[in-house]
Amino acid sequence: MLTLDKFEEASKIVSEVTLETKLVYSDFLSEKCGNSVYLKPENMQLTGAYKVRGAYYKISTLTPEERKKGLITASAGNHAQGVAYAAKKFGVRATIVMPTTTPLIKVNRTKNLGAEVVLYGDVYDEACAKAYELAKEHGYTFIHPFDDLAVATGQGTIAMEIFKELPLVEYILVPIGGGGLATGVSTLAKLLNPKIKVIGVEPAGANCMQAVSYTHLTLPTTPYV
């Protein structure tokens, strides 16, 4: 369960490896929207994205035995670098399965952070299935990119920083991919201010979350030991 205590704990832990990115006022968007609009530049993190927050906090919650087994995940870029960087900080081995279509620059950046990279499949789902297979075969601990409460808690620390700078914030717009960031940010934001409005944003051509909201859907899962 995501609680305020957990988010406060996560904020302290992720601050060991992340920058507290400061809000940037956007003249253009503020004028266009008729409101004061601020941007939170998480691209300024050392790994280039917010994903390191969830990866680092998740790894911090693992037992020494789980870390010793080695970590594994699947990603085409940002989560890969987040896990690789976090694993290096904890001094543990990380294996990242990336689709063969991943840009070489992302593959090299992940390798440069100390992770072993396995290229497999044309799309993320194929790489993820391979990662689960390797986790089962070698006993690795799987770090899911978004479907994990500890990961979502780490990502949600962004909201803690937003409220610190802008305590009277009324709306937060958060991008939706897998949903980990949106889960963490919306949960913490509502804990801090139940009246706040959190709006998820996704591409019109890839509106998976919106599509699911119109129907009942059972998602397949890949079991592993």
Give residue ranges: language-model regions.
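PLP-dependent amino-acid enzyme catalytic core
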Residues: 1-217, 223
